[in-house]
């Protein structure tokens, strides 16, 4: 884990209205977002394979998010 940089996550939290963000808070959210993104990606890969493709397309990602 730890693929997502902390700075963009910090900016997301600030966009949500926070004035200050602890480094630990940004790290925890980054870890959660990464886990969630991996789950979506895994589902999208399944959809692409089911369709007989090796390439994950936008529609695979959208379906994975909805499922």
UniProtKB/Swiss-Prot annotation:
Mind telling me which GO cellular component terms the entry cites?
chromosome; cytoplasm
Which Gene Ontology terms cover its molecular function?
DNA binding; protein heterodimerization activity
Q: Which CDD domains match?
A: HFD_archaea_histone-like (cd22909)
Chain ranges passing through the membrane: none
Compartments, as annotated in UniProt: Cytoplasm; Chromosome
Ordered alphabetically, the record's keywords are: Chromosome, Cytoplasm, DNA-binding
One Pfam family of this chain: CBFD_NFYB_HMF
Using the UniProt annotation, give all residue ranges assigned to the region (Interaction with DNA): 20-22, 54-57
SUPFAM superfamilies the record matches: Histone-fold
Function, as annotated: Binds and compact DNA (95 to 150 base pairs) to form nucleosome-like structures that contain positive DNA supercoils. Increases the resistance of DNA to thermal denaturation.
Task: Please give the subunit comment from the record.
Answer: Homodimer. Dimers then assemble into higher oligomers, with the DNA wrapped around the protein core.
| Family to which the UniProt record says this protein belongs | Belongs to the archaeal histone HMF family.
> What is the protein name stated in its UniProt record?
Archaeal histone A
Organism of origin: Pyrococcus horikoshii (strain ATCC 700860 / DSM 12428 / JCM 9974 / NBRC 100139 / OT-3)
């Amino acid at each position: 884990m730890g693929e997502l940089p902390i700075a963009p996550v910090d900016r997301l939290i600030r966009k949500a209205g926070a004035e200050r963000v602890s480094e630990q808070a940004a790290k925890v959210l980054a870890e959660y977002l990464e886990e969630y993104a991996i789950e979506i990606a895994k589902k999208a890969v399944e959809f692409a394979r089911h369709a007989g493709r090796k390439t994950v397309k936008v529609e695979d990602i959208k379906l994975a998010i909805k499922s």
